[in-house]
Amino acid sequence: MNIYDQLQAVEDRYEELGELLSDPDVVSDTKRFMELSREEANTRETVTAYREYKQVIQTISDAEEMIKDASGDPELEEMAKEELKESKAAKEEYEEKLKILLLPKDPNDDKNIILEIRGAAGGDEAALFAGDLLTMYQKYAETQGWRFEVMESSVNGVGGIKEVVAMVSGQSVYSKLKYESGAHRVQRVPVTESQGRVHTSTATVLVMPEVEEVEYDIDPKDLRIDIYHASGAGGQNVNKVATAVRMVHIPTGIKVEMQEERTQQKNRDKAMKIIRARVADHFAQIAQDEQDAERKSTVGTGDRSERIRTYNFPQNRVTDHRIGLTLQKLDTILSGKMDEVIDALVMYDQTKKLESLNN
């Protein structure tokens, strides 16, 4: 099947989806309705571009016809030639865009994410850097119009982040932030360093797609849920009513503790969101590890401990080691202006996928 047959098949399926989504039987089936809605949303951009491409093809045909019929009218002929030139350039652009749009899509790209950041090697300095990363992602989310909600956080004695869990919601969040998982290294002079020596510390980032209950159902028998009193600074109990929730997925040992909210039900709901994402991610990671050979063509190895990026403060430099990108814009990037880095990662990933399809 050539590219045009593929595109026509996508458009035909898109129109079929529109009819299915107005079918009362489909509307009443929540799981199927969500699956079809997601499929329609995932193909919408491709169909829109394909329809615009067909209009450009028609414009080229009309312009060529106009040139034939314009004998004796130099002004009309010149206008038609200019339109033909512009349309041919647009045709080439659409063909490149459509090739990329036809690449196999990550089914998680349109999802919200659970973001986890932890201070790793480097003690207090690592925790402070984890806080810097949290601020960077919060500010980037603002530029994208996303909602950023801290669900759980643990702060150390110097105000750094030992661990933070956040939900980032909005349009195509996972598609842009999925490349952030891995070890982020910082090189800078700590505030406590009296001799001006540069120290190296590390924070780790984990990005997981939000998993809806209809997509991944955890058997209640596999969960152990403990209710306890939330604790404040110094460990004292801050609530007379037990509202904090500890949730353990028994088969994997994955544990979530939640006490940010004032009610037990809200803490339970948030804990369930996180544990569902972590358990689904755990099994997805196992499946991906079994397909290592296929994943070498994409950005990085997928190893969660892989050092993906270095932030060098003395040189105001950020280096992404996976794609060899170096930018002397550390201050700009940490202020949330991450587009240049993320766009480069997306382009690299798409290029590698195109190459693998052509080989």
UniProtKB/Swiss-Prot annotation:
Protein biosynthesis in keyword set: yes
GO molecular function: translation release factor activity, codon specific
Domain of life: Bacteria
Main localization category: cytoplasm
Modification N5-methylglutamine, positions: Q236
UniProtKB keywords: Cytoplasm, Methylation, Protein biosynthesis
Localization annotation: Cytoplasm
Family annotation (Gene3D superfamilies): 3.30.160.20, 3.30.70.1660, 6.10.140.1950
One Pfam family in the UniProt entry: RF-1
Post-translational events: Methylated by PrmC. Methylation increases the termination efficiency of RF1.
Keyword Metal-binding applies: no
Annotated GO CC locations: cytoplasm
Similarity comment: family membership: Belongs to the prokaryotic/mitochondrial release factor family.
Cited HAMAP family: Rel_fac_1
Function of the protein: Peptide chain release factor 1 directs the termination of translation in response to the peptide chain termination codons UAG and UAA.
Official protein name in the record: Peptide chain release factor 1
Species classification: Bacteria, Bacillati, Bacillota, Bacilli, Lactobacillales
Gene: prfA
